[in-house]
């Protein structure tokens, strides 16, 4: 199994997960033309995709999903709540699969386990992917951790973990008070310290890759996110990857130890 990012942040998110002949796009917050260009940088075209998974209905995650699916005849998986809250444009999608937020399902060579998260959307989920040998946990939009989130992510071989903001930078910044409250709230986004606390609650003995994701360009820095997560693992800060808003990150492969 391997994974890569097309970009991560408030202006758009998309993550690729591949196992065997199966390639899934997790979220698509970029327009179709930009998505095609970003896929090309990773050596892929839309025709190589097995489908699109959607975590929730916010535009930075779903904004380009329906157009890409319609143009390239791709299936889309999402929860009932996300489907109900999603913007218009679903009619041309060849196949929409509505998923239970806690029931695993199979797409080709990937087993996918969704799990609910605290976020200000209708029925948001994040996912753990498995190819039968390795597990990749992805959690990029949640305001707080829960025991269930911890159970889902513990023991993963790779993690893509939200480090949205530095609390001091957010409070000193120029966002209006209501937006600061939303971001820092229980149903908003994890700050660096909260992400580190979540990481510290997990069994990380098999961890091969750790990526800090969904960083705010105004209220965080890559160095601060790396420092927070590396402090938990006792590893070099450079070992922690960061998903860039524009470039994402290249392919990361999971290997048998």
Question: How would you describe each model-predicted region?
Answer:
Residues 1-42, 125-140, 158:
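Conserved beta-strand hairpin/beta-sheet module of binuclear metal-dependent hydrolase folds
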Residues 4-14, 56-65, 69, 83, ...:
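Structured catalytic core of nucleotide-sugar glycosyltransferases
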Residues 26-29, 50-57, 77-80, 137-140, ...:
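Active-site neighborhood of phospho(di)ester-bond hydrolases with catalytic His/Asp-centered motifs
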Residues 32-78:
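Active-site metal-binding motif and surrounding structural segment of the metallo-beta-lactamase
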Residues 58-62, 84-85, 121-122, 144-147, ...:
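Active-site environment of divalent metal-dependent phosphoester hydrolases
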Residues 78-133:
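Metallo-beta-lactamase
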Residues 147-244:
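Cap/insert and terminal regions of metallo-dependent hydrolase folds
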Residues 238-257:
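Short, basic/aromatic-enriched C-terminal tail that caps enzymatic domains
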